[in-house]
Amino acid sequence: MKKNGGSIVNISSYSAKDPSISFPTSSTIKAGLSAFVKLFADQYSKDGIRMNNILPGFIDSFDVSNEVRSMIPMKREGRVDEIENTVVFLLSNKSSYVTGQNIRLDGGLGFSI
């Protein structure tokens, strides 16, 4: 990758920025990954290597209760294809100037907590 450049996309969680007392270890690890992506980008972007994190909220691949759904400003869980489309974009040359980012895909959950 160092020879030809490339893109790395990590799937993290909204809890990287909005930790949950229910999942303290996971939230801490995800926060560490959020910091790491910035350090990695600083070190390797000059070599054409990009790294970004996706921070999904509640996604339809899991059962989401009506109570949780009501907390999401968009009033629905995300779809797997919405995550997929973002990954495809970040791996493509269309995002060639995007690196070191933590991209929330959470239906606005992050700004409502």
Sequence positions of predicted segments:
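Conserved SDR Rossmann-fold cofactor-binding beta-strand/turn motif
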Residues: 50-60, 91, 104-106
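Helix-to-beta-strand junctions that scaffold the AdoMet/dcAdoMet cofactor pocket
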Residues: 1-4, 45
